[in-house]
Amino acid sequence: MAGQGLPLHVATLLTGLLECLGFAGVLFGWPSLVFVFKNEDYFKDLCGPDAGPIGNATGQADCKAQDERFSLIFTLGSFMNNFMTFPTGYIFDRFKTTVARLIAIFFYTTATLIIAFTSAGSAVLLFLAMPMLTIGGILFLITNLQIGNLFGQHRSTIITLYNGAFDSSSAVFLIIKLLYEKGISLRASFIFISVCSTWHVARTFLLMPRGHIPYPLPPNYSYGLCPGNGTTKEEKETAEHENRELQSKEFLSAKEETPGAGQKQELRSFWSYAFSRRFAWHLVWLSVIQLWHYLFIGTLNSLLTNMAGGDMARVSTYTNAFAFTQFGVLCAPWNGLLMDRLKQKYQKEARKTGSSTLAVALCSTVPSLALTSLLCLGFALCASVPILPLQYLTFILQVISRSFLYGSNAAFLTLAFPSEHFGKLFGLVMALSAVVSLLQFPIFTLIKGSLQNDPFYVNVMFMLAILLTFFHPFLVYRECRTWKESPSAIA
């Protein structure tokens, strides 16, 4: 049966990778799309009378309001990308895969059609389209992350691979920009993306489960076109019960796996994890690093325009370079491989000591969390230096840092908390971090206004905040030390 199921699992994996790569995270290619919108005179009426023919080529200050409008659209889109993860996570947990994916397809298709038929006169519709596009994209990601459960001990690698593909999909807007420069209209590109929704529908019913993919994977598990494979309702309920028992045992140490200990485990509700110190510091870690990334992406067009002295040819070159570097799918799996390798190492140690598998999972996340903070610090340092050629290095550090950020986030929540709460905890941390991400617009306004386009003081504050994020892996490391000294102390 395993041999028969492997081709289906591989097909699900590869098509899910393509879906995340081509559709899920396109919002983060925003600078490329802004370049096209400016050439199409979107929000051109906000520019002063002395502005050049393509925005702020000759009068940078005159198009400040136009830049702010594009920044506001990105702020709203990125906010919805995170904030709506909580309700969409609930939808996924409550109504399962098929319903969640059909909702995603509806939002995504509607958004791409709106963008396809907008023009400079109806540019305000972007405020509706971009949030809808991101809601559909994040639902694609959430429903695909469970595919890692099909591959057992490689689960972290698959999760980080999908998050890397999510990041890399920002290159889609670069392709649209390049096609636009070759004469393919914006409308034609987005109509093509809309037509691709038929593929999403087919994949939903042929290569995805109606419900959830359980972990650990029960014997003879099947899904897709013939999900039941003759399995009766009673057998399914028995398999689900056994799966819940296996999941519970994952979060109990060898000494605690007694009939009485199961009763203690049931007392741990979703809110007990949501209000834990571990979750709180993870929220701080994610919010600070993510805010810096969002601010950088949302203001990149304006930043490059200032550094290039209004030379739009150079701005186009660096915008293309930024988009070309956005293939996080190439570096994200290294993060997952690191965690999987460390987890296997700590599992051997746990078998010798009879220690908790939760502690094993926690220990495997420490290097990844710390490395993500270090990469972001390097990225912030390079971005703070107003030398245009140095931004090539900034772009590389940015994509590696962002790939590690979202891969580490999803993997940490998967490994550090019970899987039955993953959808809700993932949604909650993204929703709360979305509230923090709203700060990007007032910060952008501050830079454009009081600081007179000089982001130096803002960059210094962000670097100090990024240093604070190192406290999260330090606390997780302390928990691991506590486990080694007293295995029953980890909960």
UniProtKB/Swiss-Prot annotation:
GO molecular-function term, one example from the UniProt record: xenobiotic transmembrane transporter activity
Biological process, per Gene Ontology: hypoxanthine transport
Annotated tissue distribution: Widely expressed with highest levels in the liver and lung, followed by the pancreas. Highly expressed in macrophages.
Transmembrane segments: 17-37, 72-92, 102-122, 123-143, 156-176, 188-208, 279-299, 319-339, 356-376, 396-418, 427-447, 456-476
Activity regulation (record text): Adenine transport is strongly inhibited by decynium-22.
UniProt keyword list: Cell membrane, Glycoprotein, Lipid transport, Membrane, Phosphoprotein, Transmembrane, Transmembrane helix, Transport
Membrane topology, from the record: Multi-pass membrane protein
Recorded GO CC terms: basolateral plasma membrane
Annotated compartments: Basolateral cell membrane
Described function: Sodium-independent purine-selective nucleobase transporter which mediates the equilibrative transport of extracellular purine nucleobases such as adenine, guanine and hypoxanthine. May regulate fatty acid (FA) transport in adipocytes, acting as a positive regulator of FA efflux and as a negative regulator of FA uptake.
Stored PANTHER family: EQUILIBRATIVE NUCLEOBASE TRANSPORTER 1, SOLUTE CARRIER FAMILY 43 MEMBER 3-RELATED
Protein name per its UniProtKB record: Equilibrative nucleobase transporter 1
Organism the protein comes from: Homo sapiens
